[in-house]
Amino acid sequence: MIFIITGPSGVGKNTIINELSNHIDFHFSTSFTTRPKRDNEIEGQDYYFITDQQFNDLIDKNHMLEYEEYGGYFYGTPKSEINRDGIVILDLEVNGATKLLKSNSDYIGIFIDINDDELINRLVSRGHDEEFIDKRMILANSQREHSGEYDYYIENQDLNTAVNNIIDIICKLEEQ
């Protein structure tokens, strides 16, 4: 069973996925990206950080399930990551997630969101300047227009509630 978790940057997708790992057994799909590694990120766990040339080589060799440009960097999911038994969770950028869900109805899409004030606070805490935050908020509002295309919508106002809602979704679908 493949779950795609998406939402605007800063809504807590990584935090939710990390907390899910304390409650359920799943394989997390590690994506490739060309963006610089943040201080708190771990190579091979959060992302595989690669060059533009390496990313293009993966595309040329048809190793990517999906890929998108976001914020001036590329993000992509290797095909090898979905060939797993059990529960697989993908953390994808909204455009890539939307395209992938349209091309494969077997995947389950979960859109994560938070209110604007909290999103701005999180972006500020990451050290972004006002111009960057303004651009991200415009992008977030554009991405939210796609939230109705997902199987589930989770408002992440409280981490435990959001995690429990996702666990409930996974358990319900596993029983079917």
Segments (PLM) and residue ranges:
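Walker A/P-loop
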Residues: 14
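Small-molecule kinase domains that catalyze NTP-dependent phosphoryl transfer to phosphate-bearing small molecules
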Residues: 128-169
